[in-house]
């Protein structure tokens, strides 16, 4: 990548795609990358959420933000996102796989449908999107793939077996891709948050305070993370200066797991 001028933003001239970008952590990441100078296509299965995102960001970032609604657990959905992003802004250098969400319940209370949905939302979305965006990165010998994993894979939170199976697969995808493409200018990392102060967290806290407290009890700092704290780590990993960081699962977790 070319050397930045003194006043240039670190991601100026770069193009990013953020999946799961309409809400919560994904929305925070969209805002962070825009603030760093990237042009961003946000994707989500929630069309109305994407419309609200555009309304929120249009005044400041009208020429730098695009949205595309798709089911990214299907190959065709990921291919459609790739076409839309490239047509709008050109070749993509940064992919943030943030699409996800799972059904959190005791393992034997899952149905075949909830198990499949949890794997589809978290793992298949990352697999398909990585597969369709990697060739462009390899052609330029430069790219950043950042997966949003889960600290629960490491600390074994209650009722997270299915969710951890999906996110653990994402962690494995991270190390496999990082090694495979390490000499081709593409870094692949995972940011693994603990519970984060999103709308989902608020719903859990209100609906099941006892379960929410169990999540809090494993965090030495005694609080959940903030969206901006996760987005900040993603913003660093997306930059050229993070060129020597690859294959890592980096926890943003208030100490809920260490080392």
UniProtKB/Swiss-Prot annotation:
GO terms for molecular function: 2,3-dihydroxy-2,3-dihydro-p-cumate dehydrogenase activity. GO terms for biological process: catabolic process. It catalyses: (2R,3S)-2,3-dihydroxy-2,3-dihydro-p-cumate + NAD(+) = 2,3-dihydroxy-p-cumate + NADH + H(+). InterPro entries: NAD(P)-bd_dom_sf, Sc_DH/Rdtase_CS, SDR_fam. The keyword NAD applies. Pathway: Aromatic compound metabolism; p-cumate degradation; acetaldehyde and pyruvate from p-cumate: step 2/7. It comes from the Bacteria. The active site is at 163 (proton acceptor). Keywords: Aromatic hydrocarbons catabolism, NAD, Oxidoreductase. It is an enzyme of class 1 (oxidoreductase). The keyword Oxidoreductase applies. Its EC number is 1.3.1.58. NAD(+) binds at residues 18-42. Transmembrane segments: none annotated. Signal peptide: none annotated. Belongs to the short-chain dehydrogenases/reductases (SDR) family. This is 2,3-dihydroxy-2,3-dihydro-p-cumate dehydrogenase. It comes from Pseudomonas putida (strain ATCC 700007 / DSM 6899 / JCM 31910 / BCRC 17059 / LMG 24140 / F1). The lineage of its organism: Bacteria, Pseudomonadati, Pseudomonadota, Gammaproteobacteria, Pseudomonadales.
């Amino acid at each position: 990548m070319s050397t930045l001028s003194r006043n240039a933003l670190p991601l100026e001239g770069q193009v990013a795609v953020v999946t799961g970008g309409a809400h919560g952590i994904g929305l925070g990441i969209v805002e962070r990358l825009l603030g760093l100078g990237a042009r961003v296509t946000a994707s989500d299965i929630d069309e109305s959420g994407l419309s609200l995102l555009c309304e929120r960001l249009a005044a400041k970032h009208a020429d730098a933000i695009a949205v595309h609604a798709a089911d990214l657990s299907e190959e065709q959905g990921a291919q459609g996102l790739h076409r839309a992003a490239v047509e709008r802004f050109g070749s993509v250098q940064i992919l943030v796989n943030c699409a996800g969400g799972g059904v959190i319940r005791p393992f034997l209370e899952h149905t075949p449908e909830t198990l499949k949905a949890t794997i589809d939302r978290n793992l298949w979305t990352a697999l398909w999107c990585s597969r369709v965006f990697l060739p462009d990165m390899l052609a330029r010998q430069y790219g950043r793939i950042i997966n949003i994993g889960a600290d629960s894979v490491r600390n074994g939170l209650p009722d997270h077996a299915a969710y951890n199976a999906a996110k653990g697969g994402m962690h494995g995808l991270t190390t496999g891709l990082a090694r495979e493409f390490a000499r081709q200018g593409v870094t692949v990392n995972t940011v693994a948050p603990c519970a984060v102060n999103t709308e989902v967290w608020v719903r859990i806290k209100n609906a099941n305070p006892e379960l929410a407290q169990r999540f809090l009890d494993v965090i030495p700092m005694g609080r959940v993370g903030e969206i901006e704290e996760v987005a900040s780590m993603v913003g660093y990993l997306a930059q050229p200066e993070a060129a020597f960081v690859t294959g890592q699962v980096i926890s943003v977790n208030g100490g809920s797991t260490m080392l």
